[in-house]
Amino acid sequence: VRGRMPTMEVVNERFARNIRVGLFNLIRKSPEVSIGGIKVQKYSAFLREIVVPTNFNIVTVKPLRGSALVVCDPNLVFAVIDALFGGAGKYHTRIEGREFSPTENRVIHRLLQTIAAEYAKAWVGIYPLELEYQRSEMQPQFANIASPSEMVVTSSFLLEIGDSSCSINLCFPYSPLEPI
């Protein structure tokens, strides 16, 4: 299970370039994107690394079996909302103790559509992979895509949008990706 994953490295490089353009087209601000790395780890270990509350998006991975997670840092959600509504990126919102509002959820859905489209483009020529939105959660116990002991492949991307530092984490069960 351990070792380099050259296919995922290529996909992540492409996705980092693609998401920069996709986010610019969405918010008209050019984010800085850097790749945080690829890890193969237990699902429980991945969940422990995520600061809650956060935005867990469960997606179907077509044509593979099973689901994956697209985890958007709340700072990313608020940076996108701020940019969409003409803000300068100076105001920082806190999510603790509340759910996302209907407006915030709509923006999250648009953000996820952008992420899914750019991620599918990153797989072109390698494998015809698509992410299809299922639902969003705020707590990890409701975002089960694998058993706690199951191995997952995680990729993290660090973004700078204005004064905001934020991240996107992608988490896939290892077994469906292994043949690719």
Describe these PLM feature segments.
Residues 1-180:
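N-terminal auxiliary interaction/assembly segments of multi-subunit proteins
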